[in-house]
């Protein structure tokens, strides 16, 4: 199953109405596509980065997205794992 991960989903700078899926405590300030892909690499999950894509809620910004091929976790579990890995890597 393919899952789309937009940086907005885990961005603490965005509101729920703007597309954030995680709580403020779980989310990350301004996550980058590079950080998301590094996190997925650590989790050993296959992914494809698409740099020229825009989140529909902010179509004027080319934020990029990551297409993930996985079936082990729900989308929310995956987002939490990605955000946690990014937080851990920023603290080191």
UniProtKB/Swiss-Prot annotation:
The record's section on InterPro entries has: Signal_recog_particle_SRP19, SRP19-like_sf, SRP19_arc-type
- What family does the Swiss-Prot or TrEMBL record give for this protein? Belongs to the SRP19 family.
Tell me, what is one Gene Ontology molecular-function annotation carried by this entry? 7S RNA binding
- Protein name according to UniProt: Signal recognition particle 19 kDa protein
Alphabetized, the UniProt keywords read: Cytoplasm, Ribonucleoprotein, RNA-binding, Signal recognition particle
An example Gene Ontology CC term for this record:
signal recognition particle
Q: How does it assemble?
A: Part of the signal recognition particle protein translocation system, which is composed of SRP and FtsY. Archaeal SRP consists of a 7S RNA molecule of 300 nucleotides and two protein subunits: SRP54 and SRP19.
What is its biological role? Answer: Involved in targeting and insertion of nascent membrane proteins into the cytoplasmic membrane. Binds directly to 7S RNA and mediates binding of the 54 kDa subunit of the SRP.
Q: Which gene encodes it?
A: srp19
Could you tell me which cysteines form disulfide bridges?
A: none
One Pfam family hit = SRP19
* Record's subcellular location: Cytoplasm
Could you state one GO biological process linked to this protein? SRP-dependent cotranslational protein targeting to membrane, signal sequence recognition
* The keyword Electron transport appears for this protein: no
Instruction: Please verify whether the record's keywords include Mitochondrion.
Output: no
Query: Chief subcellular site?
Result: cytoplasm
């Amino acid at each position: 199953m393919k899952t789309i991960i937009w940086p907005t989903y885990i961005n603490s700078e965005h509101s729920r109405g703007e597309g954030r899926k995680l709580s403020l405590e779980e989310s990350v300030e301004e996550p980058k596509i590079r950080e998301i892909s590094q996190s997925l690499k650590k989790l050993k999950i296959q992914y494809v980065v698409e740099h020229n894509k825009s989140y529909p809620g902010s179509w004027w910004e080319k934020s990029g997205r990551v297409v993930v091929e996985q079936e082990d976790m729900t989308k929310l579990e995956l987002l939490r794992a990605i955000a946690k890995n990014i937080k851990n890597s920023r603290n080191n």
